[in-house]
C-alpha cells in the first residue's frame, strides 16, 4: 500500500524491513501472579535471586554472575574437512524442555538484574510520555475513499481508518487491537481494490511472519467469507475487475516446524472472491529454483500480470509477465537474467516503465515494450544522477522520483519524456515516505520525519508541485532544544562514510558524553533519519545518538551495497569500528561511555565487532541477530540471504563466514563489555536459536566480570507489529542497562 520510513514504521508499530523477503518480554514467569503455595514459592525464589543480584549490579564489580547452565551436547560438523563444534545445537529447538527451562532461568536472571537497577521506572515513564503522541501513516486514495493508519498515542497497534475526504470525519475500518488483549495481533499487509469498495488485509500473530489474509467490505465494515493462509511477506494484487486477487504462498508446514521451516517453493495463485482457498488457481511456480520468491503485480489499467522474481541477491531480480486478456496465455520472461534490479513503475498500453540499476548503479528510469522487450527497444527516460534513486511512481502524466542524497530524502517531478523536471522542496534533513498513487490522481501523499523532526503527512499537488501539511504529530517535548548534523569520516581503507549525530544543542566535546552508535549495513537497505521516541529519550538522558551509514546498504547505490556483502563483509565491520574511533578521537565520547546497538543484520554487526574489538566499547546490545553464519540458511527465510552472505556449503564462502561469524569467533578468556542480547520466542525470520547459542557461548567465554545477559521476549517475533507496551518495556530495560554500564548520572 505505501512506503513507510523507518521512524514511521516504529511509531506505527506495523512495519519492519530488516531481513524480510526482498520486496524487499517480559516473560510470563517474571510478572505472573500465581495462586496460593505456587505464588509463595515463586516470590521466595525471586527474592533469593534478587538478593544475589544486588551483589553485582555495578558493571565493574569483581563478582561474576552465576549463569544458568545451558543444555550441551557433543555435536561436531564437518565443513570441507574442517571440524566445527556446535555444543549448543539443542538450543535451536525452542520447544525442547531443556531449552524452555534454560530460557526461563536466563529471563529470571536478566529481569532480576534489571529490576534492581535504579531509574528504570523513571525511564519507562519518560518513554511512555514520549510515545504518547498521535501518529498517522500510509495515506492512499482508492475509488472515492482515503485510507490511512492512525494511532491515538499508546495503542498497541495502529488502526486503519477510511474517509471520503481529507477534511471529513474518518471511521475505523480495521482495529487489530480488538483481536487480542495483549496487542500481539498486527496488520502486516493491506491492499484496497481498484474501486475502493473492498479491502484485503493480512494479520500476523505474536510477531510471526506467517500471515492470514481476509477481505473487508468498506461500506459495511464486514468481512467476506474469504480466508487466505500460509503467506509470508506476500503482497496481494487485485485483478482488473476486482473479482479476485493474485498472491503468493508456501506449503503448510508441520506444527512443530512453524518457527524453523525453510521458506521454499513459493507459488503464485489467483483467488476468486467467494471461493475456498483450496479452489485457487495455480499461476506460476519454479520447482527448479525452490529458494526463489515470486510476487505478483497487476498494474493499474493494465492487461498484464507482472511477476517480480527474487533469486536471492538483494537489488537483483527477474521479471516475467502474462497477458490476462489473451486466451490460454502463457507466462513469458521479460527480464531473463537477474544481473540488476528492475522495479515496475507503471504500464501504459504495452509500455512498461521501470526503475533499474541496469547500466546505472545509482538507478535510472527506462521504458520497454512488453510485446517486444528486447534491449534494443529500450528507451531511457531519466538517466542516472549523482543521487541514488530509491523509488518511483506515476500519476497525472508525471513521474515522481524519490532520491537519497547523502542518506536523506530528495524528490523530483519529471515529465514522461524526461525532458522537464522540478524539485520537490523537503522540510529538512529527514526521510520522505511516499504512499501509492493512481495514474489519474492529481495528488500524492508522503510522510516526513527526522531524528529531531516530528512526523507530518503532506499532500503534494501534482499540478503546482507544492506541498501542504494535512496531518501533524505533536510530541510531548520541545524538539528545538535538539539538533541533528551530518559528518563524514574515513574508514580503514579510506572510504568516506556519512554519519548522523543527534543530541541536545550546545554539546560539550569533552569525551564524556554517553553515546549510542547504531548501524545496519546490509541487504541494500539504507538507514535514513526517522523520528523515534526512544532516540529522543536517549537525548533527554544526556546522550548522543550516532547513526552510521556504513557500506552494505543502498545509500550510494548498488556499488555501496556490493562493497559490504559476501567476501567484502569485513568492510561493514571496519566502517563501524572507524565510526567508533572517530567519535572518540573527536571527543564526542570515550570507550567507557560508548555503547553499540544493532538489530537483525545489525545484530550480526554488533556480534562481529564485539569479537574483533571488545576493548573499544563500553557496552553492547545485539538484537535478534544472525549469529550462526554457518547454519543460517537452514531456517525460515535464511535461504534468501545466501546471495547476500554466501553459504557454508561453498568452500570459499565458508572461509569468509567462519572468519567473522559472531558465534564462532567468541574468544574464550576475553574481557567483553557489559552486553544485553535480545531476541523473541516467536521470531521465525531470525530464529531465536541464533541468540540463544550466542548467549550461552559468550557467557561461558567471558573472563571479566561485566554481565552478559539475554532477554527473551514472549509472544513476539522479529519486530514487525510489536505492541507499543512491549516496545516501551524493552527500551526501558535497555536504557537502564546502559545507564548502569556507562555510569550515567541520575
Locations of the language-model features?
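Peripheral, non-catalytic segments that deliver or gate enzyme domains
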Residues: 69, 82-90, 94-513, 523-541, ...
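The conserved beta1-alpha1 loop
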Residues: 519-521, 679
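Short, positively charged and aromatic/hydrophobic N-terminal segments
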Residues: 3, 32-35, 39
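Hydrophobic beta-strand anchors of alpha/beta hydrolase catalytic cores
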Residues: 514-518, 545, 675
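Sec-dependent signal peptide recognition
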Residues: 43-49
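Bacterial Sec-dependent signal peptides at the C-terminal "C-region" and cleavage site
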Residues: 50-66
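Active-site-proximal cap/loop segments of hydrolase catalytic domains
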Residues: 534, 541, 547-746
